[in-house]
Amino acid sequence: MLSKQWAGWLLAASLGLGGFGIAAASVADAHSGHVDPRPAAASPGAARAAARYGGGAGRNAPKPIPVSGKDRVYTADQTSNTVSVIDPSANRTLGTIALGDQRLGAGLSPQYTGDVDVHGLAFSPVTKRLAVVSITSNTVDIVDTATNKVVNHTDVGRASHEGSFTADGKQFWVADRGRDTVTVVDAVHGGVLASIPVGAGPSKVVMSPDGKLAYVNHISLAEVTVVKVATHRPVDHITGLGDAFSSDEAISPDGKELWAVHKRVGKVSVIDLTHDKVTSVLTTGPDSNHPQFADTPQGKFVYLTVGGLDETLSFRRTDSGVPDATTAPATVIHDNGHAPHGIWPSGDGSRLYVGLEKSDKVDVIDTATNKVTGTIPIGQEPQAVVYAPLAAPAGSAAHLGSQGLDEQARNVPTTLPDGTAGETLDPVKGRALEATVRPVNGLDMIQLQARGLKPKTTYQAFSAGADGRKAAVVSFSTDANGNAPMVLAFSAFDGRSISLAVKNAGVAKATSFQLNRMHSGSANGAVTATDLLYCDCC
């Protein structure tokens, strides 16, 4: 049951779905194998684009680097505010880099100067530097991977999310969701070099393999904005994506293809970068998270984590750029935990490392068999994952600590208002109600996620003990689709499960009205603070 009940709750309800705005829309069911590819005919500006961008994009594809003790896997741990450091040659966690206090620590103090909500990662193989983005403190830390020490720290734009290094490793470009800009960080000395307007709600920056172009997706604009790195100017806008909300994206090693994921609708837009054209939109499943390309001994593939189904999908790439789902449906890899999120291949493509957001672990997947071969405990609530070949001296664990380790989450059973089990996994829709509990600073963080409940309804969640007694935990309201992507409460939790009941109808109506007003969006499509809360978890 609950004692010392403290703290409020955070509800980040799903944004409105909006329209696709796509001519000749193409949707593929990744599980069933149905695909209706769009024609990939060259756009009128294709030839001009090649000249404008300085040549083909596939010239700098990396060569395979065998797994060794000099490699590292990093995870951004949002609740413990750490970066977990893994030695992939032994598949063990060496320790964590603490960039701030664990949640409910000193972070509420006005004198606190640490990071809050460690979330995004990128690695430069040239300078051996790791960039770490914290989305609530709006900061970027540059870490020397040989020593695990922060070499500089920069305050960037509001709700900074994910980014990439330039080819020489001297700059780090990060998308600022709340400022409609990309901030260019001096990765050598720290500080802001420039701020580039790119359109509403930029979410992530990825670079072309030759380093000449930056591709920016958005959470409130159905396009990928193309920026010329040398001039800091947008040079193209790839439109026609499957949804206006794209949290994550990845570019292929040959620079010919980009996948932009639409988490809230469970889809992926596949983009042909030769013609700057969306070629297909795949239906992939609830909470589709991060895509990643990998050239393996078995061929060229794209992998995608689907958090709502506890799966990682594998797609074989084709010359046309459209996944051949008709003859080779996506391979489903069942993860060994809950909510797969970040993903990255080893330097030789023989393995994948997948962060399990609601299990505080990392799965190791053998790409030859598409099977999980190991699971590694790490810090709390992993988001981004990066594999860094030749990042540190073999056996080195310099300056690492243990913050966030040995405090793994547990997922407890749930009961819906009608008495049915909420944690039962529907193979298409996911779970109706998930409840994750993890220890934080002497209390428990109770995280709920609801899907497909009654729309615009206020629910009361209870902790249910073994003796049947209940204690109130938190109340929350669903959006127009019956979803509540993230609800947080902090208390001492000693129950066995979580149960739901519909709250007073009058209160529900008022709360739902306020929720709908907050998510109605402004006339100019600007990102609101409420919108940004949604992707505290993506």
PLM features per residue range, with description:
Residues 1-9:
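Bacterial Sec-dependent N-terminal signal peptides
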Residues 5-6, 14-431, 455, 472-481, ...:
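Predominantly soluble domains enriched in secretory-pathway, periplasmic, or organellar proteins
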Residues 433, 442-448:
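Structural beta-strand segments of beta-rich domains
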Residues 447-449, 482-491, 529:
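Exposed aromatic-hydrophobic patches
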Residues 457-463:
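Short beta-strand segments enriched for Tyr within beta-sheet-rich domains
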Residues 463-474:
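Short beta-strand and strand-turn-strand segments in soluble, beta-rich domains
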Residues 493-515:
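Short, surface-exposed ligand- or partner-binding patches at beta-edge/loop junctions that are enriched
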Residues 510-536:
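Short beta-strand elements
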